[in-house]
From Swiss-Prot:
Catalytic activity: (S)-4-amino-5-oxopentanoate + tRNA(Glu) + NADP(+) = L-glutamyl-tRNA(Glu) + NADPH + H(+)
Binding site for substrate: 55-58, 113, 118-120, 124
UniProt record similarity statement: Belongs to the glutamyl-tRNA reductase family.
Gene that produces this protein: hemA
Matches recorded under NCBIfam families: hemA
Residue positions of the active site: 56 (nucleophile)
Protein name: Glutamyl-tRNA reductase
An example Gene Ontology biological process: protoporphyrinogen IX biosynthetic process from glutamate
Domain notes for this protein: Possesses an unusual extended V-shaped dimeric structure with each monomer consisting of three distinct domains arranged along a curved 'spinal' alpha-helix. The N-terminal catalytic domain specifically recognizes the glutamate moiety of the substrate. The second domain is the NADPH-binding domain, and the third C-terminal domain is responsible for dimerization.
Binding residues for NADP(+): 193-198
Complex formation: Homodimer.
Record keyword Oxidoreductase present: yes
Length: 443
């Protein structure tokens, strides 16, 4: 069994393509179960383990499965997003084994985020694991991968200053607004949604004391709770088109599968505003604001991808923290690869133990019969020990005897390492073929 990660993120795919592969929490369990059903049909081997991490910046499918399932997994994901497999391949990354583990560790630690070191991704990954566990698709191999990811992320955040020298998406939005408006204390800000990202954006804007703030959310009660924290007004999402003109800045981030703010609504708002500019930030994937809105002369619309240049600033201290974090991650990768390799030998170890137990049981049955016939204990013990020795060595000696000269030296080295701890007797391996007196003593 192998571990692989298939995904696309803000560095490999545009926001519109990422939106095709965005999943809500409610969609994860049925999607994972559908994936497992699809890949366990026909002649495909094994039952794959799977988990999906879906955020505004990435969608990633983590699997523990046989290597030949990689291509079917890609085709399945492409079908879910309604694109061709070749199109997805062009924008996706496929990582296997140690590379997949390294990627998971970097994601959990915030090194692969648009905002370096951002803490939200760790919580999102933990939620993805809980959803996979509830769906029954997690499995012991992925469980180990993610638990090690969380441990590495904790060490990175404890031992380095990762994230200290970066700014958040919300802070970047405030910076952009400050470039457009002379005084943020005079603007009116509308937040659409009531999730973690909107809460963070409201915190940053509130620190600049805008003239007025409002929260529009589909669930009015949740919107009211957030609004009360910042002394803001709570409005119904259904009232948004009629009230859009009241606001100079709009920040939106919801889980809607369709845009909430359309071109027509913005055009009407601009007309009422006599074309005073509107600053808009769409942090949602899929988009909350129709992309055509960006064509309007008096609208300054920014998406998560547009904010990337701002949040990538950092300096030398940030580079030093990254180097420290990468070293911690590399140690974790080597440990996981070693564990995964050991896990691959488990079936062999189980088979060896079963074979040894079978030999032991057979010899015990034989010994008991000899004792019942009145044989001496010493004779029975001698026969039992010889029987076990012959069974243990027969297969190995037979392979040595049957091997050709080219194979014999390598096989002899392996046998020596396993049975003699590397001490090969002189003349144990000869370059020539078998001599006439070669035989299997005692077999």
């Amino acid at each position: 069994m192998s571990v692989f990660a298939l995904g696309l993120n803000h560095t490999t795919a545009p926001v519109d393509l990422r939106g095709r592969f965005a999943f809500t929490l409610e969609q994860l369990a049925p999607t994972l179960q559908g994936f497992r059903e699809r890949l366990t049909t026909g002649q495909r081997p094994g039952t794959p383990e799977a988990a999906i991490l879906s955020t505004c910046n990435r969608t990633e499918l983590y699997c523990a499965a046989e290597p030949q399932l990689v291509r079917p997994a890609l085709e399945w994901l492409a079908g879910v997003g309604g694109v061709g497999a070749d199109t997805l391949s062009h924008h996706a990354y496929m990582l296997e084994g140690g590379e997949a583990a390294r990627h998971a560790f970097r994601v959990a630690s915030g090194l692969d985020s648009m905002v370096l070191g951002e803490p939200q991704i760790l919580g999102q990954m933990k939620q993805a694991v809980r959803e996979a566990d509830a769906a029954g698709t997690l499995g012991s191999t992925l469980h180990q991968l993610f638990q090690r990811s969380f441990a590495v992320a904790k060490e990175v955040r404890t031992a380095t200053e990762i994230g200290t020298h970066s700014i958040s998406m919300a802070a970047a939005a405030v910076r952009l607004a400050a470039q457009l408006f002379e005084d943020l204390r005079e603007i009116r800000v509308l937040f659409v949604g009531a999730g973690e990202m909107i809460e963070l954006a409201a915190t940053h804007f509130s620190a600049r004391a805008p003239a007025r703030m409002a929260v529009a959310n589909r669930t009015l009660e949740r919107g009211e709770r957030l609004a009360s924290r910042f002394g803001a007004e709570s409005i119904r999402l259904s009232d948004l088109p009629q009230r859009l003109h009241e606001f100079d800045a709009v920040v939106s981030c919801t889980a809607s599968s369709l845009p909430l703010i359309g071109l027509g609504a913005v055009e009407r708002a601009l007309k009422v505003r006599r074309h005073r500019p509107i600053f808009m930030v769409d942090l949602a994937v899929p988009r909350d604001i129709e992309p055509e809105v960006a064509r309007l002369d008096d609208v300054y619309l920014y998406t998560v991808d547009d904010l990337s240049a701002i949040v990538q600033s950092g300096g030398e201290k940030r580079l030093a923290a990254v180097a420290q974090a990468e070293a911690i991650i590399e140690t974790g990768v080597q440990s996981f690869v070693h564990w995964l390799g050991q896990r691959g030998t488990v079936p062999l170890i189980q088979a060896l133990n079963a074979q040894a137990d079978s030999w032991r049981e057979n010899e015990l049955v034989r010994a008991r019969k000899l004792l019942a016939r009145g044989e001496s204990v010493d004779a029975v013990l001698d026969a039992l020990s010889r029987g076990l020795t012959q069974k243990m060595l027969h297969g190995t000696l037979a392979e040595l005897h049957a091997s050709d000269p080219a194979q014999r030296a390598q096989l002899a080295t392996t046998v020596s390492r396993l049975f003699l701890r590397g001490a090969i007797p002189p003349d144990a391996v000869r370059p020539s073929g078998p001599r006439e007196d070669d035989h299997l003593d005692g077999v």
